[in-house]
């Protein structure tokens, strides 16, 4: 079908910035960090503008490098010296492969953490999946997981315990309901129902 277009007001953008700044802070990042974004702000990609706005609200530095361009990404890492990358994890595997093939000392780069978007990095039991292991076994960086959707205009974020993602209670109310609309008991399967707040 046709993609849905969701327009954003200035209030919506402020809400996105608040969500991402709070999420990044809870992940352990602060104004001393420098972020390199390996994702787009174009083509109505809400995550791009959300992360960018949130990083600015956090008071950190940011370079918007866009997706792709492996050579350019490594040049930017060498020149800007970011502490955090925001990227799709499968692209990080390509960065590592290129670095190894071109004798780039990526293990001693400035990058300490990667905020992973768009693909899972954990199994159902919260252990690292194959993709995450492939990255961390080669590059000793900390991986942080996020999950978001345009419709809820909010992201779930992973704290340092790596036992699942959290939401910002001021912006989102999350329920897991059965077929009759009642909350399920712990461990039961249900439908996730999201109520956005402040939209």
Model-derived segments and their meaning:
Residues 1-138, 144, 161-163:
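Active-site phosphate/ATP/adenylate-binding loop shared across adenylate-forming ligases
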Residues 126-199:
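Conserved AMP-binding/adenylate-forming
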